[in-house]
A protein has these predicted regions:
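N-terminal secretory signal peptides that target proteins for export/translocation
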Residues: 1-5
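Bacterial N-terminal signal peptides
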Residues: 7-20
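Structured extracytoplasmic
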Residues: 25-206, 214-220, 226-237, 246-253, ...
C-alpha cells in the first residue's frame, strides 16, 4: 500500500482573544458578520503572535481496529514555533522540532528552531522547515504526515481563504463561560489547502469552527476532517483543537488537540478491518516569544500614567 502523506500548504494561524463586553446572541449576529469579524481578527493578530514558542507533549496510540487494544504507544516532546513568513500568501507556519521520544532524547534540547528564527528569517526558515519535516518521521503509522497542526483550521478564516469554503451556522456552545456559534465549513474545489500524495494531491477539507457570538472573532474550538483515497486504501484524518484564554499573552491559545488517522482497505469481497488507527492527544504550554526565557514570559502591559 502506498505510504500516506498529508502536507500542509498554508501556514497555521492563531487568534487574539477579545473582550466579552458587547456579546450578542447567536441569533443576533449574521453568518456574514461572524466571518468578517473572524477574518479581521486573524489579520490584526499577526504582530501579537509573531514568533511565539510553546512546548508540546504529544501521546500517540496505535491500534489495528477502532476500539481495539493498543499495539504501541509513543510519547513525543517537542518545541513548536509559530512563525511569520512574509510573501508566503498567509502569515503563519507552525514548525515542530521533536527532542524526546518515549522519555529518551533524540537530540540535545538547544532550542534549534528558536535560534534559527531569531536571526534573519530568510537564512533560517529553510533549515527550520527541514527540521520540522524531519520530526514528522517520529509519528506513529505507515506514512509521514504533518496535518497535525493545532491552529490549521484558523487559516480557513483568513479573508483571502474564506472564498474557497462554504459556511453554515449550526448551533451554539458555551466555552469558558462565553457564548460561541458553531459553524460548519466545507472546501469547495481544488487547489486545496491541505495537500496529499502526488497521486492524490487535492484533499478537500471539512469540519466545524466555534466563533464567539459577539463581534471580536475569538475562536474557542475547531474540528477538521480530511479523507484521501489511494488505490484500495482510504485514510480518514480528524483533529479537534481546544482554545483557552492565556492571561500572560492576553490570547486564546491552543491548549489541547485530539487527532485520529484511520486507514481502511477495500478488498475484492468488500471492506476489511482497519489496517491501523492512530489516536493522538497533544497538550501545549509554556507559551513565550522566541528569544525570551520561560522566566521572562509575556506579561500584560501595565497601565501607563498619563
Amino acid at each position: 500500500m502506498p505510504a500516506r502523506v498529508l502536507r500542509v500548504l498554508v501556514p497555521a494561524l492563531a487568534l487574539l482573544a477579545g473582550a466579552e463586553a458587547g456579546t450578542a446572541g447567536a441569533d443576533e449576529i449574521s453568518l456574514v458578520d461572524l466571518l468578517r469579524s473572524a477574518g479581521d481578527y486573524v489579520i490584526g493578530y499577526a504582530d501579537a503572535f509573531r514568533l511565539v514558542v510553546a512546548e508540546e507533549e504529544y501521546v500517540q496510540r496505535l491500534r489495528t481496529s477502532p476500539g481495539g487494544p493498543v499495539q504501541e504507544t509513543r510519547r513525543l516532546g517537542s518545541d513548536v514555533v509559530f512563525v511569520h513568513v512574509s510573501g508566503a500568501g498567509f502569515p503563519w507556519w507552525l514548525l515542530r522540532d521533536v527532542y524526546e521520544v518515549n522519555g529518551s532524547p533524540v537530540r540535545d534540547r538547544q532550542a534549534r528552531l528558536e535560534k534559527l528564527l531569531v536571526g534573519p528569517m530568510e537564512d533560517g526558515l529553510a533549515r527550520a522547515r527541514a527540521i520540522a519535516d524531519e520530526g514528522a518521521r517520529f509519528n506513529l503509522g505507515r506514512g509521514h504526515w504533518n496535518f497535525n497542526v493545532p491552529t490549521l483550521v484558523l487559516a480557513f478564516l483568513h479573508p483571502s481563504v474564506q472564498p474557497r469554503f462554504s459556511f453554515a451556522k449550526k448551533g451554539r456552545a458555551t466555552i469558558e463561560g462565553r457564548s460561541f456559534v458553531e459553524i460548519a465549513f466545507r472546501e469547495l474545489s481544488p487547489p486545496t489547502v491541505v495537500r496529499g500524495p502526488d497521486s492524490h494531491p487535492d484533499i478537500l477539507a471539512a469540519g466545524r469552527v466555534w466563533i464567539h457570538a459577539g463581534r471580536d472573532g475569538t475562536v474557542g474550538r475547531t474540528e477538521l476532517t480530511l479523507e484521501v483515497r489511494e488505490g484500495r486504501a482510504t485514510t480518514r484524518a480528524t483533529a479537534t483543537t481546544e482554545y483557552r484564554p492565556y492571561p500572560p499573552l492576553a490570547l486564546w491559545v491552543p491548549v489541547e488537540m485530539h487527532d485520529r488517522v484511520q486507514t481502511d482497505v477495500v478488498g475484492a469481497r468488500g471492506p476489511s478491518n482497519s489496517v491501523e488507527v492512530v489516536d493522538g492527544l497533544a497538550a501545549y504550554s509554556g507559551f513565550r516569544q522566541a528569544g525570551v526565557s520561560t522566566q521572562e514570559e509575556f506579561r500584560v502591559p501595565e497601565p501607563q500614567p498619563r
